[in-house]
């Protein structure tokens, strides 16, 4: 220890628990300083030594060389600590030049630009003046009245030079005091008496009623409280002393050729010093006021440029017209200190190289080029060479390694044995982007990678590169082996499914191997022994595809071996031989042609029942088998494999006839252009699908034997059906028809590409398809960045979400049920509850047996019990309802998807959630590119069919029978349920208004029976009574217009937005129904039969005609459809997580009640909901052009939509509560990903939602010091209330608020984390004023200060510390 001390190498890092940020007082700045910088000079151009008292002065900042003073009088260690009397430099290590600061005594006070210009301006808020006014004072434009004295001037009033002169003439020189510059602002700030000011503001807040004033007062009061609590003085925001950064942190480097490169900061400091010195001289020489003032303003500008260049006025630029990088720029953005150096560091002991496939590797191995290994493991090789006495010193060892002596290679072999290395492929989108492997030394220069881990790395071998990192310490090696080894990462943390799954060629080989053909040689033979079969195969008595019988030994449930005779093939038996013996893994799982899905299922089963080791061995053997048969099968494909179905021409002719009919209807004015466009696109979508289906049938036909008795099966079909290569979409384009293409704006071009790639495209078709292809390319380029940004925001908001305890013992939970859309179960209940915990005891509904106890994990066996019990909804615990004070508890989170067991404490689930949501986003943007712009839109849903044999139940049934004896739905929220024999809901569908109902309440229906149908492209307006039509408020050219179609010349009446009518009355176009006497007909609900028409409605009837019940009197055309792809989806995901108001958002009803249309107001319609209990109704003002989905007299439930569109998330929270908000966000986000076939567990989305719901807004301050309208952390709020109750005070009330992820990240408790995310200057300004303390609880802030993260293995370390 003493030796270490002697050499002064003792680490001087301090142990600390928290970090506090404050405004530095002038005294503090002086105490940091080692001397004042007086001269702007840097170094002497001849001697290259630093100038005395300059910016690099050795006397102030320390010696340039270790233990050597500047003049050279004292050299070496022995003189340590002596200060040279000649040059004044202390003899010490030169490292102090990175630590010692200097200072500049300013000749005039200067405002700190962050407190002046960072919005909201703190100085102007405190002084209750506008920022513009403060600037005028600081930059010497206007004077401010400090003391009005005997004059009638106001305190704080601004005066120009002329006005000041006039006032002096009027009141006399000494009647009042007015001043200018930073001195006066400093004086005004000094005079503020915070306790009194706080009291005054508080009283004013109580007495004011104006909302704007309240907001302003709350802002000011908050700032005053911050200053009081932090003990900062407001006058410190104006600086008298400027700190100077250590010179090594703003270096001056000599370039070749004698020129110097310098940090911009030196230039900025020089300007400050120059101006400061000039100002001192001017003041000493008693220069005229105007010159001094100008110099002070220039000094202010110089200091502004140093702190934040470009924030105010023109940025200071260098000779090349580039703005200087100021102190703020050093912190800000991707290249700033936080993100470039603190969160992302370069790593030593690493290398990178191209990857090639290594099919003979085991799953835990990678091939490392010898050259790389030799370089990376150098320290280990040196120590071993010395240990074995092969080399006497490190130097000798070094020479041996450089000479690549034979013994070095032997030592290298030993060194790398069981020493894992980390492989990383950029971009690392989720944690499986870095995995550990045991290296095998190989010749060549490329890293060999195991094929099965490619999916996790998203790697392919078309030139991808990977980086290798060496864990050095024993702890790092241990963690790499236990947590990061590829064999320990079999399941994906996003959805709990295996990610180590055979893919591409392996799948193809296994599919080929497990095919069974009819009429093969030796069909029906029986075998009891594999060697016997091999013999038969070798002598060509059978083939690998021959259907045979085989006696196979199998484990039964008791674990006894029983022989079973199976109908199988030799190929399938080869796979069967690899299966681990377990009663749960039956032979039937592989006794079929194995597709990618089947293989994934088998691997999952093996993992669940046999454990990790068995899975790894099984996957490795499968891979080898797959590769072998992919090779020997000789599968390839040529032109003839692309079969063009004969029915193609028929389908196309039919569709073209159909389209002619639509054209005719359009010409006759029966449908609008938009409807025609939609119908045409639908027709072509259906045609493309039919052609594609016929093509698939054709290529899937059982193969015919040829002369050599070798059966052929279509290669393309094999590749697609097995999931090895190519999608249905791509094959459709090869042999069917390319179909519809999208324009660059997402619109579908209504003329499809009829040809396919085999037939070849015409020039016109080629031109049309180029459009879509380019869109794919451009999307990929643009959307990757936005997806990466979404991931970054998600990580930032959730980074401090860590499992901190086993159980928070809450009784709360959320109820989940399967998601059913269009009568189809999209997500079964089982999928939603697997790996979650029960919130209550769950019993069998019939036998009343206990299935699950509260807090028990729902695993696969429990799932079977729940399914057999027929439960359709279950209460589960969720992170949303977890009541842990910090972090989240394991029970509320449930299963760790990557291991399949209960999550362990210290798991960083927030980051995992963010990666699971963000990673597919990036993948999906790149996926458009492979289909080449073909439109991926199916035909619109225009009917609903029964998905089961079941009994019909109709909710909100309101039906009229029209003149054609058809049942027409009149309800806006009609739902059709299908019930099984026990009355459990099997499916449910929403039936839109105006649909024809083909069944009724209580009917028994069979599977595929049509239940209802409707026109998907228009929203009809339908009559409930028969009568005569009367048009009201339809004034030609003002509220209704005859639109003559250019193409057809047929006029139709369309409602237009009515401008203010000349008579001053608002027009509300409507149709009324009259009876025979000419009086308005009354409806059953007691209201008049009148139908309001929204803007854009097309009339279907003429004035004065007689109509029947159920007739359509007007249609509202729906907008033409655009393709739904992830590009539409990613912005939607971002919109949801940012909690933005959707464009054209819906309005939702806040109460149950009846709808009434009130008097319109300007361009708004008034909708009133009257509650059933007769209390005060609620009013909604909606823009006139919007389509109102309710009619007068309709009964709406809380949460029903009044206007079409996506609801605003904040509204859902306010009206429906947290649980429904969460389920809405989860459903919407999942819908986007589901469209692309990506599976993400709900709990990941719930973690993010929990982070969005961290803040509450105070509605009533009670007896606490909280202010109404203040937004604070939920936990903080609970703590304050607990204190208040203890002290016998009334607790405060607050409501939960939803914040977007960006806002949540910026308002996190840790200012270090927030500053490193975005808006660095604003965050730090705020934190400094409030004297914030960072407790270092999250991951990011710990990485920044260089400590172990408090998660994973660092979690316990952090707790013990």
Swiss-Prot record:
GO biological process: DNA-templated transcription
MF-aspect GO terms: DNA binding; DNA-directed RNA polymerase activity; magnesium ion binding; zinc ion binding
Keyword Magnesium: yes
GO cellular component, one term: DNA-directed RNA polymerase complex
Keywords linked to the UniProt accession: DNA-directed RNA polymerase, Magnesium, Metal-binding, Nucleotidyltransferase, Transcription, Transferase, Zinc
Annotated residues for binding of Mg(2+): 460, 462, 464
Cofactor binding note: Binds 1 Mg(2+) ion per subunit.
Pfam families in alphabetical order: RNA_pol_Rpb1_1, RNA_pol_Rpb1_2, RNA_pol_Rpb1_3, RNA_pol_Rpb1_4, RNA_pol_Rpb1_5
UniProt catalytic activity: RNA(n) + a ribonucleoside 5'-triphosphate = RNA(n+1) + diphosphate
SMART domains: RPOLA_N (SM00663)
Cofactor: Mg(2+); Zn(2+)
Residues where Zn(2+) 2 binds: 808, 882, 889, 892
Signal sequence interval, chain numbering: none
Top-level enzyme category: transferase
Keyword presence, Metal-binding: yes
Its EC number(s): 2.7.7.6
Annotated Zn(2+) 1 binding sites: 69, 71, 84, 87
Family to which this protein belongs: Belongs to the RNA polymerase beta' chain family.
Listed HAMAP family: RNApol_bact_RpoC
NCBIfam families: rpoC_TIGR
Subunit structure: The RNAP catalytic core consists of 2 alpha, 1 beta, 1 beta' and 1 omega subunit. When a sigma factor is associated with the core the holoenzyme is formed, which can initiate transcription.
Biological function: DNA-dependent RNA polymerase catalyzes the transcription of DNA into RNA using the four ribonucleoside triphosphates as substrates.
Official protein name in the record: DNA-directed RNA polymerase subunit beta'
Species annotation: Rickettsia bellii (strain RML369-C)
Gene name in the database record: rpoC
